């Protein structure tokens, strides 16, 4: 029972991830987090962030 539940959960997670990757929401989310860190280190805010890595910062 426990093994079956684990397999079902894994299939659901894989399905959700594949849906997100096809819409590239996950990639964009990761890129935006990296952008926030990079811009934050420069004392700026994120202006544009898109996947694949396209990041532009703006002042203040």
Swiss-Prot record:
<keyword id="KW-1015">Disulfide bond</keyword>
<dbReference type="Pfam" id="PF05453">
    <property type="entry name" value="Toxin_6"/>
</dbReference>
<keyword id="KW-0872">Ion channel impairing toxin</keyword>
<keyword id="KW-0632">Potassium channel impairing toxin</keyword>
<dbReference type="InterPro" id="IPR008911">
    <property type="entry name" value="Toxin_alpha-KTx_8/9"/>
</dbReference>
<keyword id="KW-0528">Neurotoxin</keyword>
<comment type="function">
    <text>Inhibits potassium channels.</text>
</comment>
<feature type="disulfide bond">
    <location>
        <begin position="35"/>
        <end position="55"/>
    </location>
</feature>
<feature type="disulfide bond">
    <location>
        <begin position="32"/>
        <end position="49"/>
    </location>
</feature>
<feature type="modified residue" description="Lysine amide">
    <location>
        <position position="59"/>
    </location>
</feature>
<dbReference type="GO" id="GO:0015459">
    <property type="term" value="F:potassium channel regulator activity"/>
</dbReference>
<keyword id="KW-0027">Amidation</keyword>
<feature type="signal peptide">
    <location>
        <begin position="1"/>
        <end position="28"/>
    </location>
</feature>
<feature type="disulfide bond">
    <location>
        <begin position="39"/>
        <end position="57"/>
    </location>
</feature>
<dbReference type="GO" id="GO:0005576">
    <property type="term" value="C:extracellular region"/>
</dbReference>
<keyword id="KW-0800">Toxin</keyword>
<dbReference type="GO" id="GO:0008200">
    <property type="term" value="F:ion channel inhibitor activity"/>
</dbReference>
<keyword id="KW-0732">Signal</keyword>
<protein>
    <recommendedName>
        <fullName>Putative potassium channel blocker TXKS1</fullName>
    </recommendedName>
</protein>
<keyword id="KW-0964">Secreted</keyword>
<dbReference type="GO" id="GO:0090729">
    <property type="term" value="F:toxin activity"/>
</dbReference>
């Amino acid at each position: 029972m426990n093994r079956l539940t684990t397999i079902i959960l894994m299939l659901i997670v894989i399905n959700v991830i594949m849906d997100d990757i096809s819409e590239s929401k996950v990639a964009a989310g990761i890129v935006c987090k990296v952008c926030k860190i990079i811009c934050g280190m420069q004392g700026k805010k994120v202006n544009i962030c898109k996947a694949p890595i396209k990041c532009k910062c703006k002042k203040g």
